[in-house]
Amino acid sequence: MSFTRKKGFYKQDVNKTAWELPKTYVSLTHIGSGAYGSVCSAIDKRSGEKVAIKKLSRPFQSEIFAKRAYRELLLLKHMQHENVIGLLDVFTPASSLRNFHDFYLVMPFMQTDLQKIMGMEFSEDKIQYLVYQMLKGLKYIHSAGVVHRDLKPGNLAVNEDCELKILDFGLARHTDVEMTGYVVTRWYRAPEVILSWMHYNQTVDIWSVGCIMAEMLTGKTLFKGKDYLDQLTQILKVTGVPGAEFVQKLNDKAAKSYIQSLPQSPKKDFSQLFPRASPQATDLLEKMLELDVDKRLTASQALAHPFFEPFRDPEEETEAQQPLEDSLEREKLIVDEWKQHIYKEIVNFSPIARKDSRRRSGMKLQ
């Protein structure tokens, strides 16, 4: 049998999966698995830094899997912002395209995510700092022409110094159900995405930030719908049933008829809904949890809100130097063609300097 693994690589079984990686990465520890792959922490011997390594699950099983793998690699390569996860390294044990079956993404290691710590009581200054970082990351992602579409607490990595990075952006497309057989949680999704009832824009992510911030204030999920219709019912209980001006904007006839059939109900008083929040916090929430996408705040507008005054540094609110160029986005390629494109990206990859915060908040999560 011919030897197909590159020199300098070693093999280790992790959680019943074979990992093959360069000898520069040691102390492999399994930290999680999902629909698209498994993640281990490791130490990079060159820097002594702890990193996260993701092995994609069967990236070339089908055209859909291969396209998603290509897009994930492209997105991670493009993102260079302290509040957005980026790529430190990418490698394959394959010595040529012919025996290329797997590849691994190396990213900064983060201790936990918001999902795991949602039960803790967040002080207002912690909420300010964490939400400010979410919005800085979104401003950058949006300026690259990317929309997250599936922002939720589990996609927000945090470390013990309250530093936050956005994960899994730009991947939540219609392929989710086809690939995994289940619908990703809808509790944080904007109504226009859940129901496809009107055009949507980058402010879909601002709605999600509103839901997450509300949960940090109360310790409870704001809109916990059992299904699509129940999700809408939960939302309208808070936002009120919209009037004729909003209904005119709906593209979907069924949604139009349904909304028109509902009895008018007023918007809830946010100061009563969030009694421990400051007036500035409730004002920001109202502007992020706005049903009408044309009236909802953008990331830039939200960053300028007085709620963030204690932490704001406009110089850190940077935009991408150029939009993400995904010339293959609309291409229908076969698996072998996707494989060629991915292999080329891996071979040509050169690491870039990390973008990390120049300042420290002095805050601790616990």
Curated annotation (Swiss-Prot):
Keyword Nucleotide-binding carried by entry: yes
Chain positions recorded as ATP binding sites: I31, G32, S33, G34, A35, Y36, G37, S38, V39, K54
Catalytic activity: L-seryl-[protein] + ATP = O-phospho-L-seryl-[protein] + ADP + H(+); L-threonyl-[protein] + ATP = O-phospho-L-threonyl-[protein] + ADP + H(+)
Keyword Transcription regulation: yes
GO biological process: intracellular signal transduction
Entry-linked PROSITE patterns: MAPK, PROTEIN_KINASE_ATP, PROTEIN_KINASE_DOM
Gene transcribed to yield this protein: MAPK13
Active site residues per record: D150
InterPro entries: Kinase-like_dom_sf, MAP_kinase, MAP_kinase_CS, MAPK13, MAPK_p38-like, Prot_kinase_dom, Protein_kinase_ATP_BS
UniProt protein name: Mitogen-activated protein kinase 13
SUPFAM superfamilies: Protein kinase-like (PK-like)
Molecular-function annotations in GO: ATP binding; MAP kinase activity; protein serine kinase activity; protein serine/threonine kinase activity
Sequence similarity: Belongs to the protein kinase superfamily. CMGC Ser/Thr protein kinase family. MAP kinase subfamily.
Domain note: The TXY motif contains the threonine and tyrosine residues whose phosphorylation activates the MAP kinases.
Names of required cofactors: Mg(2+)
Summary of activators and inhibitors of this protein: Activated by phosphorylation on threonine and tyrosine by dual specificity kinases, MAP2K3/MKK3 MAP2K6/MKK6, MAP2K4/MKK4 and MAP2K7/MKK7. Activation by ultraviolet radiation, hyperosmotic shock, anisomycin or by TNF-alpha is mediated by MAP2K3/MKK3. Inhibited by dual specificity phosphatase DUSP1.
Modification sites for Phosphoserine: S47, S350
Residue span(s) of domain Protein kinase: 25-308
Phosphotyrosine found at: Y182
Motif (TXY): 180-182
CDD domains per the UniProt record, alphabetical: STKc_p38delta
Phosphothreonine sites (modified residues): T180
PTM annotation: Dually phosphorylated on Thr-180 and Tyr-182 by MAP2K3/MKK3, MAP2K4/MKK4, MAP2K6/MKK6 and MAP2K7/MKK7, which activates the enzyme. Dephosphorylated by dual specificity phosphatase DUSP1.
SMART domains: S_TKc
